């Protein structure tokens, strides 16, 4: 499996997507915050 090596060294064509790839691990945290805000909005029923 060289996928980790491939992802660590992206080709030049995908260099513009690097900021997006850096943000990807944070997305589950946003879902957690969204769930909390949603529950707060409906009053924690």
Swiss-Prot record:
Q: Which UniProt keywords apply?
A: Chloroplast, Membrane, Photosynthesis, Photosystem II, Plastid, Reaction center, Thylakoid, Transmembrane, Transmembrane helix
**Coiled coil segments of this chain:** none
What is its membrane topology? Single-pass membrane protein
**Which SUPFAM superfamilies does the record associate with it?**
Photosystem II reaction center protein K, PsbK (SSF161037)
Q: Which GO terms describe its cellular component?
A: chloroplast thylakoid membrane; photosystem II reaction center
Which InterPro entries does the entry mention? PSII_PsbK, PSII_PsbK_sf
Where does this protein reside within or beyond the cell? Plastid, Chloroplast thylakoid membrane
Q: Where are the transmembrane segments?
A: 23-43
Q: Which domain of life is it from?
A: Eukaryota
Those residues forming the propeptide, per the database entry, are 1-8
Q: Provide the function of this protein.
A: One of the components of the core complex of photosystem II (PSII). PSII is a light-driven water:plastoquinone oxidoreductase that uses light energy to abstract electrons from H(2)O, generating O(2) and a proton gradient subsequently used for ATP formation. It consists of a core antenna complex that captures photons, and an electron transfer chain that converts photonic excitation into a charge separation.
Family membership, please give it. Answer: Belongs to the PsbK family.
Instruction: Quote the subunit structure annotation.
Output: PSII is composed of 1 copy each of membrane proteins PsbA, PsbB, PsbC, PsbD, PsbE, PsbF, PsbH, PsbI, PsbJ, PsbK, PsbL, PsbM, PsbT, PsbX, PsbY, PsbZ, Psb30/Ycf12, at least 3 peripheral proteins of the oxygen-evolving complex and a large number of cofactors. It forms dimeric complexes.
Q: What is this protein called?
A: Photosystem II reaction center protein K
| Source organism per UniProt | Pyropia yezoensis
Q: Which gene encodes it?
A: psbK
